[in-house]
């Protein structure tokens, strides 16, 4: 079978943005993200500073037998704004007889976050570089991207800092499942909760792929009043999404969700956390930019939380709180 290979180079900031845009296109068979190989490096290893600094190359494939010129033009037009704003190169199009196997990929996708986490695709060959590394194997999807969204990265940095073995944790808005996997591999027990059926399936797949099914329970549903907010991203939910009651049962809640949901659930977060002699009741929030920072922090402070830590990446921000 022959394929139309469409590719572009993009920045760290825009890699998951590209995936989100491509989710609108039917019939995309496969998405591959690799580390960018810079053709502008001289033999001495110096970069041509006049060239933009790309981080990743994204390749995706359409069956050549059913691919039309109109479909390719639609994809090119969809991605054009990223090219015009300097976030991606112009779309490149070629015909290939076979897609490359994992062993044939140049610069396979390997990305480090914090001191220990290493994000990999399911098939990327990898040998640990240091003791204590924690591999997180994540399938790149158009629904949830690569796991490199700034909010995800900030969450992982705080998770690495605060999660310890034997904690009982709620991952609210689990999405791809990457945060649940990370916490399970740090020794925690996790309830992964999302009100989107696609997210629930993606989380379950990631849990099995990373062999943490004994530590992670995946459910469709929401916490407390979150079940009354509808689909947080505006999509469809099943009727009567199960509700997890906000009673003192979690040592930590991690929520990488929209600002308005953080605000709506502030009191439920407080009720769902428990304080013990060894655990103060922790909340990690992410998924919003500095535009909403003050409103989220104010709502959580009023609900009885104390800010203890913060991580920032460009306009994105994540906070750690404890029960005051």
Range-by-range predicted roles:
Residues 18-25, 70-82:
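Short amphipathic alpha-helices in soluble, non-transmembrane regions
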Residues 1-66:
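Non-catalytic accessory regions of SAM-dependent methyltransferases
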Residues 142, 146-224:
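Conserved SAM/SAH cofactor-binding pocket of Class I
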């Amino acid at each position: 079978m022959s394929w139309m290979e469409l590719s572009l180079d993009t920045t760290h900031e825009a890699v998951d943005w590209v995936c989100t845009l491509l989710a609108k296109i039917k019939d995309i068979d496969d998405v591959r993200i690799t580390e960018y190989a810079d053709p502008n490096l001289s033999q001495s290893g110096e970069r041509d500073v006049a060239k933009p600094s790309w981080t990743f190359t994204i390749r995706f494939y359409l069956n050549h037998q059913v691919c039309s010129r109109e479909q390719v033009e639609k994809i090119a037009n969809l991605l054009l704004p990223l090219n015009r704003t300097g976030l991606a190169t112009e779309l490149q199009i070629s015909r290939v007889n076979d897609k490359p196997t994992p062993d044939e990929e140049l610069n396979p996708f390997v990305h480090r976050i914090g001191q220990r986490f290493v994000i990999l695709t399911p098939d990327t060959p990898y040998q640990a570089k240091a003791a204590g590394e924690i591999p997180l194997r994540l399938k790149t999807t158009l629904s949830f991207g690569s796991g490199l969204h700034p909010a995800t990265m900030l969450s992982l940095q705080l998770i690495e800092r605060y999660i310890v073995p034997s904690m009982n944790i709620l991952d609210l808005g689990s999405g791809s499942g990457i945060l649940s996997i990370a916490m399970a591999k740090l020794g925690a027990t996790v309830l992964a909760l999302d009100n989107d059926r696609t997210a629930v399936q993606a989380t379950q797949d990631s849990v099995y792929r990373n062999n943490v099914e004994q530590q992670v329970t995946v459910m469709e549903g929401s916490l407390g009043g979150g079940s009354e907010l509808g689909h947080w991203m505006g999509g469809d939910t099943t009727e009567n999404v199960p509700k997890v009651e906000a009673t003192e049962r979690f040592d930590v809640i991690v929520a990488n969700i929209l600002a308005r949901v953080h605000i709506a659930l502030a009191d439920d977060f407080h009720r769902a956390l428990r304080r013990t002699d060894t655990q103060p009741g922790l909340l990690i929030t992410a998924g919003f930019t500095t535009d909403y920072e003050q409103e989220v922090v104010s709502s959580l402070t009023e609900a009885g939380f104390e800010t203890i830590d913060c991580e920032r990446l460009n306009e994105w921000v994540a906070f750690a709180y404890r029960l005051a």
